[in-house]
Amino acid sequence: MSTKQVTCRYFLHGVCREGSRCLFSHDLNNSKPSTICKFYQRGVCAYGERCRYDHIKPSSRGGGGGAPEDQAGGGGAGGGGAGIGGAGGGPSVRGGMKKNLVLRDRVLGVDRVDRMFGAPADSMWSDVSTAAAPHSYVEAIRTGLDASAQDQATPPVCGPSQNLPQLCPYAANGHCFYEENCTYLHGDLCEVCGLQVLHPHDSEQRRAHEKMCLAAFEADMEKAFAAQLSQDKVCSICMEVVVQKANPSDRRFGILSSCCHTFCLACIRKWRCTRTFSNTIIKSCPECRVVSEFVIPSVYWVEDQEDKDHLIDLFKSGVSKKACKYFDQGRGSCPFGGKCLYLHAFPDGTRAEPDRPRKQLSSEGNVRFMNSVRLWDFIEEREQRSVPPLPALDDDMAELRELFMQMSGPSHDGPETPPTADQ
């Protein structure tokens, strides 16, 4: 099918910028597409009178033609009244929902502005605004954006809490533009958060909000106490106040899991990354020499053991979701094995089973556990093996030389010779 047989949709609205170069047809005689609003026919058009498409009701025979909205009673306020309680027969379910949604747009737009400036509101419009008020402003705006979801949605089961009036979301967030003229209910003021969020007639909602508000208030108080405790903590390595460092990214504590000495995260990580000392010295605290398995980064200083255990649990749970860079989704080998805190998983998401540690007996008789045997382990062990001092080696060579000279000397039958200086 050629594109010239398809009418340009932009030309229909007078906004085609291609002109004669357009690949689609600009001839309305060959193709007359339907400009009827399909959302209006479903009863979910959120634009109302501002819609650019034709609002035509479907005929009773199922055809595409019908009377436009202004002839059916939707063109003005009087037409709206005829559409709601029209004498031409009761409206269907879709027709009723359509009229309610069209009137919602008017209630949210023109009617409330008129009432703010003291204009007399029609009694019929007042009844419609009370009966057809949406549950929230967001719901009224989103109406018509997902027509299929609206058609398939089942009506909610009416309960005791759903019959209560809805709280105004703008008043709950701090300020409502309509104030006392607002259709929605303004809640009571909460003493903790200072917002109008307490429903006057729903005790369950009040208790739930007060409980949530108190929990948030306690969390904020704990953060305030932790910030106050961290104000004067000095790093034991760089001797600077951690929270007063010039670089904001350096204002973090490196909390050791086994001691309570204060270090900034950058200094303690630099200490533990050095290769000058043995592994035991690197993992120990620079002050008390207590070995700590890992360092927990924290914005606030934690000193209590219970709080530290909670922080360690949070740290482990967060780290366990990150992929291990040494394991590399099965392509590499992690030197920590089953003790690694990071995630060991393959590309398909399955977790790798931890390797069983293997025992190795060194030449000195020491037994150590290792996950994998590599050539580099033997080279590293040989380099770290202690070398005897040179004076002891010279003494051994001197003893061997003296023993050799004695064994290679003359027999006892001959005359004895005095020992030389070399011997």
UniProtKB/Swiss-Prot annotation:
SMART domains for the chain: RING, ZnF_C3H1
One annotated GO biological process: nervous system development
UniProt KW keywords: Cytoplasm, Developmental protein, Differentiation, Metal-binding, Neurogenesis, Nucleus, Repeat, Transcription, Transcription regulation, Transferase, Ubl conjugation pathway, Zinc, Zinc-finger
Recorded catalytic activity of this chain's protein: S-ubiquitinyl-[E2 ubiquitin-conjugating enzyme]-L-cysteine + [acceptor protein]-L-lysine = [E2 ubiquitin-conjugating enzyme]-L-cysteine + N(6)-ubiquitinyl-[acceptor protein]-L-lysine
Example of a GO MF term: zinc ion binding
Zinc fingers, RING-type class: 235-289
Gene Ontology, cellular component aspect: cytoplasm; nucleus
Positions of the UniProt region annotated as Disordered: 59-90
C3H1-type zinc finger segments: 2-29, 31-58, 162-189, 318-347
Entry function: E3 ubiquitin ligase catalyzing the covalent attachment of ubiquitin moieties onto substrate proteins. Inhibits neurogenesis and axis formation during embryonic development by modulating the phosphatidylinositol 3-kinase (PI3K) pathway. Acts downstream of PI3K and akt1 to up-regulate gsk3b mRNA expression.
Name recorded for this polypeptide: E3 ubiquitin-protein ligase makorin-2
The species this protein was found in: Seriola quinqueradiata
